[in-house]
């Protein structure tokens, strides 16, 4: 650019009409619009007043909603008019780049830093090259670096402006902590502002302004995040920076274990939001993750490293010398958590779980019985060898109903194999532990590993060990011969509760329990019964099983029925007693006789079966010709059983008609 004399031409006519104020207003408009040619022409038409007009002061309506004293250079710097700024600073000494004409005492650098334009970085570079001083304050004592406004369209310009104008945040503490390990510091308080990544990676300027972290008064009500329940694995994984803070006053967020509005360390509850420890690829992009809280990936380093599958699964490099307030890693072998491969959750470390204050844990809702506890990780830890058996027994008691084998889960062909395996196992229980065989099921019968024959003994042993009825000194004698009958009773009771179809009692009329017939779907088909066509479900069968056993507790036949189970080849006699049938027909309470089920036809079937004990009489009954020719009926008892079943089915058919 040439000097001002190169722009001045001798006008052929007098200057344009209008006063000096109007001409300065026109120059300010041209400077705001970055009209280089128009500004050059306006200065040329000014003649001898061109120098005064180039550095003249006019009134400009700014952001303060008032007229402010501004020069064309200051207006051009505010709106990022790099062409006009280059023209004006090239005029030599005619334009003062450090001039402060207004009452606010702002310079051209103040206007460029607070303008928020896309070309703010280029304008600041032109002003600094022309001799602008970034250490000149305004009337309020603010430097150009204190009034920086980042352009919304280019957030990276913030760091460049800070470097050019000499502003540098004091990140020494955070940088030293982050460089020593992969565990980042806690998010800063809102007074520290937001900073882009480019501001941390840029180099230091010779002129630095050290502004440390805001000091807060000592708050004794803030909990210590490194002691008590706040340092436990349970709180760190499921409550740290998850629960909102209830304090309504300003305090240090880095010392508070709860989350605050707008905090970067905010986490989702892994018990309510099923996400993994894998970082989300869209979280750091402009606009954030479109899935929001429903995303299956972690949002931020705190969600990733405090996830139950990641927290304290590795050893810290500093070990016991670690000085971080919140560390994501274990500092010794006792704090190390072992996560199973088939589980998305983690296991509590022995030291952390034993050091939890139970009163505080109950208040925070971290105990297993708390209503707010929705997540229950498996309690067995490989590192906790001393209490692993008791924890495993406690877990098995809660999951037995979910993991036990059910008869309706198997095919019809597999029921015979199940009966054969059960008889072998009951026989093996009567043998000494050293000589017990290990029966195996066929590959076609799919039973979950939780009740495999190899660990069924341990399951019931741990169950009895956890019961208050068995003291600790009797833990080794649970499988003595004195406890065999109690164990067999427990096996059959659990089988009757878990299976809606009792496979051991469905093929013989001797196994017909009158109470079960009264409540069975076959008994409901009879028009004599008030329970006609009542739908049945597995739940009703399980609930009704203990009720059907109550009337026969004191029965002599029932009390001696287990006498023949001791042998592997023993057969249980589930025959129907006529006295029990009489008691069933008799009303239990006055006024309820009309609700009792009529089972008189069952007694008639049993009496017919006892009278027709001879083969000649059996042959005379209808529907038995096909049964007589079967080669698999070896004795008279089996033939009699099949005959009674046929008569029973015919009676049911007649009842339906």
From Swiss-Prot:
Biased composition (Low complexity): 176-206
Keywords from the named record: ANK repeat, DNA-binding, Metal-binding, Repeat, Zinc, Zinc-finger
ANK repeat extents: 68-97, 104-136
Family annotation (Pfam families): Ank_2 (PF12796), zf-CCCH (PF00642), zf-CCCH_AtC3H23 (PF25512)
PROSITE patterns linked: ANK_REP_REGION, ANK_REPEAT, ZF_C3H1
Sequence intervals crossing the membrane: none
UniProt-annotated stretches for the region Disordered: 176-222, 507-566
GO biological process: regulation of gene expression
GO molecular function, one term: zinc ion binding
Domain of life from the UniProt record: Eukaryota
C3H1-type zinc finger span: 274-302, 311-333
Ranges of Polar residues composition bias in the record: 549-562
Protein name (record): Zinc finger CCCH domain-containing protein 50
Organism for this UniProt entry: Oryza sativa subsp. japonica (Rice)
């Amino acid at each position: 650019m040439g000097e001002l004399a190169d722009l001045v031409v001798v006008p052929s006519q007098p200057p344009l009409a209008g006063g000096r104020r109007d001409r300065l207003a026109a120059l300010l408009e041209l400077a705001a619009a970055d009209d280089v040619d128009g500004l050059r022409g306006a200065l040329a038409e000014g003649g001898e007043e061109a120098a005064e007009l180039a550095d003249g002061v006019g009134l400009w309506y700014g952001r303060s909603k008032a007229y402010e004293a501004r020069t064309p250079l200051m207006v051009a710097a505010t709106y990022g008019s790099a062409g006009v700024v280059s023209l004006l600073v090239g005029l030599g000494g005619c334009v003062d780049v450090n001039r402060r004409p207004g009452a606010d005492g702002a310079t051209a650098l103040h206007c460029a830093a607070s303008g928020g334009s896309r070309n703010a970085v280029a304008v600041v570079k032109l002003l600094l090259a022309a001799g602008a001083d970034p250490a000149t304050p305004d009337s309020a004592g603010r430097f150009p670096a204190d009034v920086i406004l980042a352009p919304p369209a280019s957030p990276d310009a913030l760091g460049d402006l800070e470097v050019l104008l000499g502003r540098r945040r004091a990140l020494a503490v955070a940088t030293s902590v982050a460089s020593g390990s992969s565990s980042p510091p806690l998010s800063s308080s809102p007074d520290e502002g937001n900073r882009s990544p480019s501001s941390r990676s840029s180099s230091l300027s010779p002129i630095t302004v050290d502004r440390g972290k805001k000091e807060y008064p000592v708050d004794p009500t803030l909990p210590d995040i490194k002691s008590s329940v706040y340092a436990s694995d349970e709180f760190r994984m499921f409550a740290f920076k998850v629960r909102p803070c209830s304090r309504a006053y300003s305090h240090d967020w880095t010392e508070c274990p709860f989350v605050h509005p707008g905090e970067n360390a905010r986490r989702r509850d892994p018990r309510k939001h099923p996400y993994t420890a894998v970082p989300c690829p869209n979280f750091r992009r402009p606009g954030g993750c479109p899935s929001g809280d429903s995303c299956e990936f972690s949002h931020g380093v705190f969600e990733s490293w405090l996830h139950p599958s990641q927290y304290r699964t590795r050893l810290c490099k500093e070990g016991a010398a670690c000085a971080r307030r919140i560390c994501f890693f274990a500092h010794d072998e006792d704090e190390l958590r072992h996560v199973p491969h088939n589980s998305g959750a983690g296991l509590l470390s022995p030291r952390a779980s034993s050091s939890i204050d139970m009163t505080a844990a109950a208040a925070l809702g971290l105990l297993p019985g708390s209503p707010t506890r929705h997540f229950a990780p498996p309690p067995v830890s490989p590192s906790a060898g001393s209490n692993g058996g008791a924890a495993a027994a406690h877990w098995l008691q809660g999951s037995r109903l979910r993991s036990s084998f059910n008869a309706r889960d198997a095919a019809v062909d597999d029921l015979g194999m199940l009966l054969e395996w059960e008889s072998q196992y009951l026989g093996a229980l009567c043998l000494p532990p050293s000589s017990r065989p290990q029966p195996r099921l066929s590959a076609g019968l799919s039973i979950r590993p939780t009740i495999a024959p190899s660990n069924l003994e341990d399951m019931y042993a741990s169950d009895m060990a956890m019961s208050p009825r068995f003291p600790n000194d009797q833990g080794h004698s649970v499988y003595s011969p004195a406890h065999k009958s109690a164990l067999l009773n427990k096996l059959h009771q659990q089988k009757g509760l878990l299976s809606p179809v009792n496979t051991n009692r469905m093929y013989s009329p001797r196994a017909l329990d009158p109470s079960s017939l009264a409540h069975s779907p076959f008994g409901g088909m009879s028009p004599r019964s008030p329970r006609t066509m009542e739908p049945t479900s597995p739940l009703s069968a399980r609930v009704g099983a203990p009720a059907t056993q109550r009337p026969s507790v004191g029965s002599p036949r029932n009390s001696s029925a287990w006498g023949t189970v001791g042998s592997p080849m023993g057969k249980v006699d589930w025959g129907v007693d006529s006295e029990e049938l009489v008691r069933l027909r008799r009303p239990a309470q006055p006024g309820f006789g009309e609700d009792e089920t009529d089972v008189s036809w069952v007694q008639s079937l049993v009496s017919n079966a006892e009278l027709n004990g001879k083969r000649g009489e059996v042959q005379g009954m209808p529907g038995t010709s096909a049964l007589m020719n079967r080669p698999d009926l070896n004795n008279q008892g089996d033939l009699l059983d099949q005959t009674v079943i046929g008569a029973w089915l015919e009676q049911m058919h007649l009842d339906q008609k």
